[in-house]
Design a protein with these regions (language model features):
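Beta-lactamase-like hydrolase cores
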Residues: 29-52
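A domain-level signal for caspase-like cysteine endopeptidase catalytic cores
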Residues: 19-21, 53-57
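Active-site-proximal loop/helix of nucleotide/amide-processing enzymes and allied scaffolds
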Residues: 16-27, 78-228
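Detector for glycine-centered tight turns/loop "hinges" at secondary-structure junctions
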Residues: 65-66, 140
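Short beta-strand scaffold segments in enzyme catalytic cores
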Residues: 56-63, 130-136
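Short turn/helix-capping motifs enriched in Asx and small/polar residues
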Residues: 1-22
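Structured interaction and signal-relay segments at domain junctions
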Residues: 69-79
Length: 228
């Protein structure tokens, strides 16, 4: 049975949301089914429809490219994963947006790449195809990771790489911000919140580019200029 909880202005939340979300909090989130709004779209059409959203949306597709379910939790930080949908067992690809100008972070200009939560979900939910994240910040469009064809996948190594990437991101972004602030101070200038934010999230993209991904049997793809 699909229990419904009414929410003024948002329509009804469905029972599709399971015990996982894209934010990695380990807590279920209300899932608002928006499949009808995107019905009939290809994966790339759906991604172009959500990349400018200020809250996270998610869509899952089967191996024939059919949209199974799409929706949102109306949060700029995460969206519930609809693992309770009756056709979840057909899921092949999972895509979602990383808001680059969310209401809770007015100075954020980059959606940024994957978090450890994205990798954990991909592995725990046994996504057979791709996990994708889309945004529309400067020089970014689509981030993709997937198992490398013909390679043996080492899930533990892949997860460790993502965790290490977050550590490198935090360390290097702090260092980079300080370097830029010091250089600007000599010129009598300051770093704006938007510029600081761009440095922080830009560093995240670089931390993912490592041979460790390939050694673990996966591919990481960053599409900068064309919307796939």
């Amino acid at each position: 049975m699909n229990y419904i909880v009414m929410r003024g202005g948002r329509g009804a939340s469905s029972s599709y949301g399971g015990d996982r979300n894209t934010g990695g909090t380990g807590k279920p989130m209300k899932f608002y089914d928006k499949t009808k709004s995107f019905q009939g779209m290809t994966k790339h059409e759906f991604e172009n429809a959500i990349r400018d959203k200020t809250v996270e949306y998610i869509g899952v597709f089967n191996d024939k490219g059919e949209l199974l379910v799409a929706g949102t939790s109306y949060s700029p930080n995460a969206v519930g994963v609809p693992t309770n949908h009756p056709r979840w067992n057909e899921v092949h690809d999972l895509t979602h947006n990383h808001p680059y100008k969310p209401a809770n972070e007015p100075n954020r200009t980059i959606g940024a790449t994957f978090s450890t939560a994205d990798v954990e979900n991909h592995l725990a939910l046994d996504i057979k195809g791709e996990t994708r994240a889309v945004s529309n910040g400067p020089n970014e469009n689509t981030y993709i990771f997937r198992a490398k064809a013909g390679a043996k996948q080492n899930k533990n190594a892949f997860l460790k790489h993502s965790q290490k990437s977050e550590g490198v991101w935090n360390r290097d972004s702090t260092k980079k911000v300080k370097e830029v602030e010091k250089r600007l101070a000599k010129q009598g200038k300051t770093l704006s919140p938007a510029q600081r934010n761009q440095i922080v999230y830009g560093t995240a993209k670089h931390s993912w580019k490592s041979k460790a991904v390939t050694r673990a049997g996966y591919e990481y793809i960053e599409v900068k200029k064309s919307h796939w």
